[in-house]
């Protein structure tokens, strides 16, 4: 009886430790699971609009990554720190300032609202990325036409 309880407790501990990671998700190849989505880094450089279009054309219709919590920001930072090369300084994320009805407001390319903010410095540029100098943890305004690598966030396979 005691052995059965310790095995059950051990399995419960493993389940709870993996529950926030998305370990049970069926993600496309070369993607990393986290919570309810799959993330993939592309080193190929594109401007913001082309990177967003590329993510939307992926299987499962993704978007440039939206970062909605400090925990998700840390996951993305760790993902980028493993993949980056010496000359890669920025990565596009899905945040952009939109001019709608003469009101400038920030929103994610997937339509979700900005509920978590990690903007280092606000400038007049309309697109945002992560910078190597901050360990890919802070958001920077970048010129939307500059080519940078990017991160796509897609739903898992059904």
UniProtKB/Swiss-Prot annotation:
Keyword Calcium appears in the UniProt entry: yes
Cystines in this chain: 27-38, 55-152, 127-144
InterPro entries the UniProt entry points to: C-type_lectin-like (IPR001304), C-type_lectin-like/link_sf (IPR016186), C-type_lectin/snaclec_domain (IPR050111), C-type_lectin_CS (IPR018378), CTDL_fold (IPR016187)
Entry-linked Pfam families: Lectin_C
GO cellular component: extracellular region
SMART domains attached to this UniProt entry: CLECT
Keyword terms of this UniProt record: Blood coagulation cascade activating toxin, Calcium, Disulfide bond, Hemostasis impairing toxin, Metal-binding, Secreted, Signal, Toxin
Predominant subcellular localization, coarse grouping: secreted
Molecular function in Gene Ontology: metal ion binding; toxin activity
Signal peptide span: 1-23
Protein family membership: Belongs to the snaclec family.
Any further remark recorded for this protein: Calcium is required for ligand binding.
Record's subunit section: Heterotrimer; disulfide-linked. The heterotrimer consists of 1 heavy chain (a metalloproteinase) and 2 light chains: LC1 and LC2.
Function: Regulatory subunit of the blood coagulation factor X-activating enzyme. Activates coagulation factor X (F10) by cleaving the Arg-Ile bond at position 234, activates coagulation factor IX (F9) by cleaving the Arg-Val bond at position 226 and is also able to activate protein C (PROC). May serve as an exosite by which the enzyme recognizes and binds to the Gla domain of factor X (F10) in a calcium-dependent manner.
Name of the protein: Snaclec coagulation factor X-activating enzyme light chain 2
Organism for this UniProt entry: Macrovipera lebetinus (Levantine viper)
Gene: LC2
């Amino acid at each position: 009886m005691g052995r059965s309880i310790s095995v059950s407790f051990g399995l419960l501990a493993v389940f709870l430790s993996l529950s926030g990671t998305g370990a049970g998700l069926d993600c496309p190849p070369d993607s990393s699971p986290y919570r309810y989505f799959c993330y993939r880094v592309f080193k190929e450089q594109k401007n913001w609009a082309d990177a967003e279009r590329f993510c939307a054309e992926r299987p499962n219709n993704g978007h440039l990554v939206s970062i909605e919590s400090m925990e998700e920001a840390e996951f993305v930072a760790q993902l980028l720190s493993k993949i980056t090369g010496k000359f890669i300084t920025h990565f596009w994320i899905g945040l952009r300032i939109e001019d709608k009805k003469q009101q400038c407001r920030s929103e994610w390319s997937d339509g979700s609202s900005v509920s978590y903010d990690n903007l280092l410095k606000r400038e007049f540029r309309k697109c945002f990325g992560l910078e190597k100098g901050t360990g890919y943890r802070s958001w920077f305004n970048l010129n939307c036409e500059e080519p940078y690598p990017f991160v796509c966030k897609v739903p898992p396979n059904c």
